[in-house]
Amino acid sequence: MKPSIVAKLEALHERHEEVQALLGDAGIIADQDRFRALSREYAQLSDVSRCFTDWQQVQDDIETAQMMLDDPEMREMAQEELREAKEKSEQLEQQLQVLLLPKDPDDERNAFLEVRAGTGGDEAALFAGDLFRMYSRYAEARRWRVEIMSMSEGEHGGYKEIIAKISGDGVYGRLKFESGGHRVQRVPATESQGRIHTSACTVAVMPELPEAELPDINPADLRIDTFRSSGAGGQHVNTTDSAIRITHLPTGIVVECQDERSQHKNKAKALSVLGARIHAAETAKRQQAEASTRRNLLGSGDRSDRNRTYNFPQGRVTDHRINLTLYRLDETMEGKLDMLIEPIVQEHQADLLAALSEQE
C-alpha cells in the first residue's frame, strides 16, 4: 500500500481514538448537539479504524513469517503462513481503499422516485406501471416505505407519470443509478399481429433534502395553480380544488401533487419535490462543469442516456452502461434488483478508485 494512503489511514485511526476519548468527557455529554455530531463521526470512522488495525496486525504476521524462513525446520510452515498473510493483506487493502472513497452525503437519505412514460403511447404508460411496481417490490423487500405523492394514470392502465417518496436506510445511495432511460421490447396486449414494439420510460431519483439544505426559492418565481383532484379519495374528490400545480418560472420545472385531501398538505409536498428537482438540476449542472475539466465524469450518476433494455420475448434484461446481460427478467420485474444494482455500484467504486490513484 502506498505510504501516502498509510499516512491517511494512521491519521483517521488516531482521530477515531481521539473521538472515543471525547465521547467519555462529561462536558461533551452535556452538550447534546456536540455529542450527537461526535457519535456520528465515531460511527463513520469505526470501520476504517478496525480494518486498519487488522491490516497492521497482518503486516506484523508477514514480518514474523519472513524471519522464520531462515530456519530450515520452520520454513515449510512459514511459507504457508506467509502466503495466507499476504492474501489477507491484499483483501484488507482493497477494503480500506473502498472505505477511503469519498462518500456522497446524500446516500443515506430518503429519495423521490419519478417514473414517466416516454415514447410508445399506451404501452409506455403500462411499462411505467410495471417499473413502479418493480421498485415498490424492491422497497418492500428492504423494508422501505413508499408514499405516492402524485400520479397521472394512463388511459388503458399504468401511468403517464408517477412520483413517490421512498423512506428508509440508504434509499438514495441504492437507487440513484436508476436515473435515466429504461426501454422495453415486447408484444403489446393490443397488438394483433404479434409484432414486438419498443417503448421507453424515464426514471429520476432525487434525494430528499432537510429543510435547511433546500435551495432558496423566491416565492415571486413560483406560479401556483389549484385544480380538482382526479385520483382516489371517495366522495371528496372533484368537490374542492385541493390539488396543486407549482411552476418554477426560472427553470420551467413543474410539480403537481393531488394525493392529499388538504390543499395545504399538497402544497407542502409539491414544494419539497420542487426543491429536490432544483437541487438535482443544480448538481447536474455543476458536475457537467467539473467534467469539462476532467477526463471522466465520476460519481454523478451520469450513466443515464440508456440505462437498461427489458426484452420480454427473450426474458432478458441488459444494462448498457456496464455491458451486463441477465436472462432473469421475471425476477427483475418482481423487484429482485440487487443483481443489477450491485455491479453498477462496484463499477462506480472502481471509477472512484482509479481517480484516487491518479490523484496519488
From Swiss-Prot:
Residue numbers spanned by region Disordered: 284-313
Entry superkingdom: Bacteria
Gene name, Swiss-Prot/TrEMBL: prfA
GO annotation, cellular component aspect: cytoplasm
SMART domains xrefs: PCRF (SM00937)
Modified-residue entries (N5-methylglutamine), positions: 235
Function: Peptide chain release factor 1 directs the termination of translation in response to the peptide chain termination codons UAG and UAA.
PTM description: Methylated by PrmC. Methylation increases the termination efficiency of RF1.
Protein name as annotated: Peptide chain release factor 1
GO-annotated molecular function: translation release factor activity, codon specific
Keywords noted in UniProt: Cytoplasm, Methylation, Protein biosynthesis
Annotated localization: Cytoplasm
Keyword Cytoplasm belongs to the record: yes
